[in-house]
Amino acid sequence: MRIKFLVVLAVICLFAHYASASGMGGDKKPKDAPKPKDAPKPKEVKPVKAESSEYEIEVIKHQKEKTEKKEKEKKTHVETKKEVKKKEKKQIPCSEKLKDEKLDCETKGVPAGYKAIFKFTENEECDWTCDYEALPPPPGAKKDDKKEKKTVKVVKPPKEKPPKKLRKECSGEKVIKFQNCLVKIRGLIAFGDKTKNFDKKFAKLVQGKQKKGAKKAKGGKKAAPKPGPKPGPKQADKPKDAKK
């Protein structure tokens, strides 16, 4: 009985396995079958770049070069604008620069019976003068009433120049204080320089001058005593034991 049961069970299992295999195969479609039009297209997955870091570096480098180029162009544009402005300032004639001065000359402080004559020279400083000339007498006036010609010059004051720097004297005979001794030395030594330009020759010369000065000081004459009462003889000190 057991053997029959096992055989039947094996047959059932084989049948079930065959049925399941045939059902799965039936659902499969052939490879060359045409796809339906309404089916959604699968998304294209872009492959990941292995050298992504190098690509990013190249992009950054390109952007940097682009910004540097723009900055250079801006600088050149600004510089050209500045140069154009400088040229325009330089090319302004003196007649335009001295408009206010001319107006002041012709309107302010003009005496009666005189007219203002404004003159200027076309140069960098635009020097100008304001003269006053007497007007001609009217036709009905007498000849005796002639007015003397009067000219008044107003000169533009000169610009104050900065004082020149005094140069150090670097040649000729100099008196230099060296080791509390005034020594005259001829040579290229700047005044007040005590150590930098002293070489062996000058040091020897200084030593020789010092020795000569010391000898003269020793062999000099003694000063005469001042007139006055002579001091008396000093009294001898008494011994301490005499009191006892």
Curated annotation (Swiss-Prot):
Sections of the chain in a coiled coil: none
Keywords attached to this entry: Repeat, Secreted, Signal
Compositional bias per record (Basic residues), positions renumbered to this chain: 209-224
Gene Ontology CC annotations of this record: extracellular region
Membrane-spanning ranges: none
Residues in the signal sequence: 1-21
Phenotypic consequence of residue 166 to P: In allele A:2
Major subcellular site: secreted
Subcellular compartments: Secreted
Claim: Iron-sulfur is one of the keywords in the record: no
Sequence repeat placement: 29-34, 35-40, 41-47, 156-159, 161-164, 165-168, 225-228, 229-232, 233-236, 237-240
Keyword presence, Repeat: yes
Region 3 X 6 AA approximate tandem repeats of K-P-K-D-A-P, residue ranges: 29-47
Regions of compositional bias (Basic and acidic residues) in chain numbering: 26-86, 157-169, 235-244
Tissue distribution: Salivary gland.
Chain residue ranges for the region called 3 X 4 AA approximate tandem repeats of K-P-P-K: 156-168
Ranges where the record places region Disordered: 23-91, 137-169, 206-244
4 X 4 AA approximate tandem repeats of P-K-[PQ]-[GA]: annotated segments: 225-240
Known function: Used by the larvae to construct a supramolecular structure, the larval tube.
The protein, known as: Salivary gland SP38-40.A protein
Organism: Chironomus tentans (Midge)
